[in-house]
Amino acid sequence: MHGTRASGASRRAFRRLRAYEKALDMPELPPRARKGESSIMGHTDNYTLLCDFYELTMGNGYFQTGMDQQICYFDVFFRDVPDGGGFAIAAGLEQIIDYIQDLRFSPDDVDFLRGKGVFSEAFLQYLLHFQFTGDIWAVPEGTPIFPGEPILTVRAPAIQAQFIETYVLLILNHQSLIATKSNRIVRAAQGRPVSEFGSRRAQGADAAVLGARASYIA
C-alpha cells in the first residue's frame, strides 16, 4: 500500500457495492452492534448478540423442555501446544468479566430475534429479563497454562452457560494466542527491548487493541 487516498475506481466500486446490497435488501446489523461506546476500543461495549446463532436456538430448546434451570459445568481447555512450546499464557479474563456483567437483551435485541420467526414468544420474554447468575473460576491473566487442564470453569443454569460459550472462546483463544507468542518472543530476546507492532497485520481494530493488551500481559 502506497497511500491512503481512495482512487476514483475504488470510490466507484464502493458505490456499486452499496447499490448491490440495497438491491438485495440485505438485513441490517443487530441493533446493539451499532450503539454504545467502549472505554477500550471506542465503539459498542455491548456484545450480547455476538454469538453463534445456535446458542440462541439451543437456549430456546432448553426453555421449552424445562431444562433452562438445570445446573451444569463447562470447562475451557486446549489439547496441545503447537511447535513444542510446552505451555501457553492465559489472557482475556478482564474482557470476559466485562461481558458477563453487561450481558442484557434490550427490547431492540428481542425485536430483532422475533423477526427471525424461530423463537417462542415465552423465550423472547425470558430474554428481556436475562441475567447471568452463575459462577466462574479462572486462572489469573499471565498464568502459564498447559494442555488438558481447565483454564476457566463455568457453573450456571444450562441456558446461561450455553449462551456465553461463543464470546468466552473468542476472547480466550485470541488473547491467549497473542500472549503466548509474545512470551516466546520476549524470552528469545533475552533481555533486549521488544516492540509491539501487531496493528499492522491484525484482523481489525479490536484485534489490534486487544492483541496489544495481551502482548503487554505476556
Positions of predicted regions on the chain:
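Buried, small/hydrophobic-residue-enriched core segments of structured protein domains
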Residues: S38-Y73, D80-P82, V118, L124-T133, ...
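N-terminal, Lys/Arg-enriched amphipathic/low-complexity engagement segments
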Residues: C72-L128, W137
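Serine residues within intrinsically disordered or low-complexity segments
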Residues: S7-S10, P30, S38-S39
